Amino acid sequence: MLLALFVSCKDKKSKIDPFAPITNQVDSALHRKDTVAVPVETGPVPTEADESFNDFIYAYASDDQFQHQRTVFPLPYYNGEVPSKIEERFWKHDDLFTRQPYYTLLFDKEEDMDIVGDTSLKSVQVEWIYMKTQMVKKYYFQRKKGCWMLEAINLRPIKKNEDEHFVEFFERFATDSLFQCERIRQPLVFVTNDPDDDFSILETTLELNQWFAFKPALPTDRLSNINYGQSNRENSATKILALKGIGNGFSNVLYFQRRGGQWELYKFEDTGI
């Protein structure tokens, strides 16, 4: 099947992974963990991890002392419209998505993927999107005087409009194989590595049975997202869901389009190492 698949390729493209920076930066954070400790008595000072939010967030989630130093206490916490504050003595270490085999990112359009790894960012939000309860937990990070700090957490319901909401759609898409079959465009565009050229990728198509052979394990409970400033509009006609491994070379991207008010998968990219 693989031989026939590669022979039927339609196009070759340069092998460019827009997410390569985050994997490289997270890898580097793993090796620089000892360098991010900040003397308590001097307060937060910029470290090498602050140069990129991707480096910072891994260090923040991995190092308990660093997490305390980079969280504003008492931390404002909003449960819907109800405000409260978390004192430092009640704070529990938050691993964010670092204990998972992969994390996810959401975009409205492909050009927004280039913002990943931007070192000039001053404000970033890390999100947990709970599909079953239709809630979003958002962590607000700001970079001030060169230091990234967690300044607030907000838990709120997902906003919806009259059209099929992407999160509701994706929960069913990930758990219901019959529904999944109905919502995959045929033929499905497939982008993958060229086995004969390490610097190129192939674009071909998959039949429905081939999709089930190649598809990744999809998240069924919650989605993570890092909002670097990319567009994530509720009325967008397209959504891109990237699944990225942490330091293991895994990289899958799912491209969805809304047609006639309903979401469908029209392109699948597997360019992992």
Protein language model features and the residues they cover:
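Surface-exposed beta-loop interaction hotspot
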Residues: 145-182, 190-202
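Sec-dependent bacterial lipoprotein signal peptides
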Residues: 1-7
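Post-signal peptide N-terminal segment of mature Sec-exported envelope proteins
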Residues: 17-47
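Short beta-strand edge/turn micro-motifs at domain boundaries
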Residues: 131-160, 249-273
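Coil residues (strongly favoring Ser/Thr
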Residues: 28, 34-35, 51, 95, ...
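Surface-exposed, charged secondary-structure patches
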Residues: 76-80, 84-135, 198-250
